[in-house]
Amino acid sequence: MDKRISIAIDGPAAAGKSTVAKVVAKKLSYVYIDTGAMYRTITYAALEQKVDIENEEKLMEVVKNVNIEFQQGENTQLVFLNGQDVSEVIRTPDVTNRVSIVAKHRLVREEMVRRQQGLAKKGGVVMDGRDIGTHVLPDAEVKIFMLASVEERAERRHLENMNKGFDSNLEQLREEIARRDKLDSEREVSPLKKADDALELDTTSLSIEEVVQKIMGIVSGVFAK
């Protein structure tokens, strides 16, 4: 497996992309790039500075002054904002409920895509997000589009919130996930969309291990060519 390829994993909110992408990256000894964490970091920075996230011009002032770095922790990936560890605070419901608004802005996405492509230049990456296969890494050798029902995704996020000690309401989560799906799918710039050459994977009734196994099978097929 000397060949180092790029793997793009796309899908809607709470489809399990990050969890699966991390495991796949670890198995391959690849770099994992969580593009969602980048948008979350921008969102967190804007909220901290009390910037109107609907105002693209003001948001870009935040973006220009934000340096985002990833470091591998013991069991997880750490995210740093200008040297500060923000790995936990960017996962709070406040950030989660606003990140799709930040991500809809054209100039913000263009800058994030530029940074993401820079990180992926040498290959050997697993990147997950909403527009990786269609826009960020259109030439990725493996493209996966992960799906799961709103109900399943709400239950996963509810469990995740409870485990982190966040207040969580299942019905509210269903509504928020459906709203994020709508925002992500209907935005003008790089909407959530399956790439024509992506393989669709419905994870509703699959465990993380089963999803990882399927993706590793696809990757092995590419290495065998």
UniProtKB/Swiss-Prot annotation:
- Signal keyword on record: no
User: Quick one: which residues bind ATP?
Assistant: G11, P12, A13, A14, A15, G16, K17, S18, T19
Organism whose genome encodes this protein: Bacillus mycoides (strain KBAB4) (Bacillus weihenstephanensis)
Write out the catalysed reaction: CMP + ATP = CDP + ADP; dCMP + ATP = dCDP + ADP
Q: What is this protein called?
A: Cytidylate kinase
Query: Which Gene Ontology terms of cellular component type are present?
Result: cytosol
EC number assigned by the record: 2.7.4.25
Query: Gene3D superfamilies given for it?
Result: P-loop containing nucleotide triphosphate hydrolases (3.40.50.300)
